Amino acid sequence: MIPGGLREPIRGMLSDDPLDRWSLDDLFHWSAGTLRRSARPIRDYRTDRPVKFREREYRNTRMLAHAYGIHWKEAAKQLRSKEFDTWLHRGLSDSDLVEVLEGIITSSAGSEGDVGDAKLTTRVCSAMDPEGPLKYKGLTVMPDGMGYALSAAVEAGDKDTIILVTELIQKGIASDWFEQKIVLGRSDLTLESKAFKTLQQFVRHSGPGYGVERVLYELNPFLPCRSKPVSTAYVYSLRDLLPALDKFVEEKGSLGKLVDRHIAAFIASRIKGSVDNQLAALEHSTGVSVGAKIAMTGLLAKVQNEYQHQMTPNLTAWLVDELQPAIAKYHSKSLRKRIAEKMEEVAISGDLIGLYQTLSNKNIVAKDDKGQSRAKREYTDSMREIKRLESEEYQFEAKRTGWRIAAGISLVIGTVTTIGVFSW
C-alpha cells in the first residue's frame, strides 16, 4: 500500500497530462509544505455495464480503447452495430461522452473500408481515452513521439510503420487528433496542430525535399542526415554538411548520384532562407535530368551562402564534370566557351555559389535565347531569299531583264558606232 501522504506527489509525477505533471519545483514546494496546487483527481474510466469485445468483457473505457486500437477492423464493425448503440445508452453514465461517440459514429456513416474503419476507430479511441495516445491501424503513438517513431522505423527499415506514420499526417488524422484535444480544452496544442497541418502539405508532394524524408527531419530537429555519403559523419547540423560531402568526394571520387532525397530534405528543413524555387525545379524534373542537377547544386549553394567560409574544391570539381551537359543547352558557341572556362575557374576555387550562378543566370539564358531567335529569323529570311532567287519565275524575269539590258547596250553601241563612222 502507498502511504496516504505520498499519494498526491506520486499522482502528480505520474500524471498522463503533461500540463498537470509535477516538476522538480512542484516536488520541492510539496516537501516544504508550500505547494499551491494539487494533482487533479484521476479520471474515472469505469462503465456502468460491461461491453464484450473479442470474447472479453470490458468495464473501463480506457482498456476498451486499447483493445480497439489493436484490433481496429473488428472494432469498427462493433462500433457500427446495434448492440454497441444499445450499450452506449445503457452502459455509460457520462452523457457528454455518449454524445461525442454518437456524433463520431454518425459522421462516419458511408465511409466503410480500411480508411473509413481506421479513422472511425481512431476517433472513438481518442474520445474514450482522451489522455491516451493516438491509435491508428495497430500503431499506438503520442503525436509528440511520432518523430521518434518515424526515425526508429527509418533506421530499422520498417516500411509498415513508415507508411502508417505517413498516412497519419497525409490524411490529416494527426491534425484531427489535435483538434479534438483542443475542443476538449487543450489550447496549448494549437501550435502543434498548425505544425502538423504544415507537415500534411509537405508529405503531399512527392519530389525531393518533401515527402516522408522532409517529415522525418522536421519532426526530429537534431536528427543527423541519413544520406549514405554522410551517414558515418553524424551531420546533425547544416554547418557540417558541405565539409562531409567534400571529404566523401575526396575519398570516393564522386557522390554516386547528385539528386539525393535525404540531403534535399535535410537542407530544406534546416536552411534559414527559402528554397522553394530549387525544390520546385527538383519536383518537376527527373533525378538524372540537367535541370534537376542544377536545382540540387542550387540547394548546396544555398548552404554555402549561409556558411560562406566553407569552400568545397573536391565537391565542386565533381559537380563541374556532372554538369557538363548543361553547357550544351546554350546555343551560342562563344557563350558555351566562356561558360566552360568559368566553370573550370569555380572548380578550382570550390565556389558552389559561382557555379550555380553561372548555370542559372536568367539574363544570360534570355540573351542566348534572344540571339538564337534572331539567328533563326536571319536564317529564315536568307533561305526565303535563296528560294526566290532560284525560282523559275525569277530566272525567267532575270533573263528578260538581261535581254533588255543587252539590247539597250547594243543599241547604244550601234548608235555610237554609226555616229562615229559618219563623223569620220
Residue ranges of each PLM-predicted region?
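Long, charged low-complexity terminal regions
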Residues: 144-402, 421
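Conserved C-terminal C-lobe helix
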Residues: 2-16
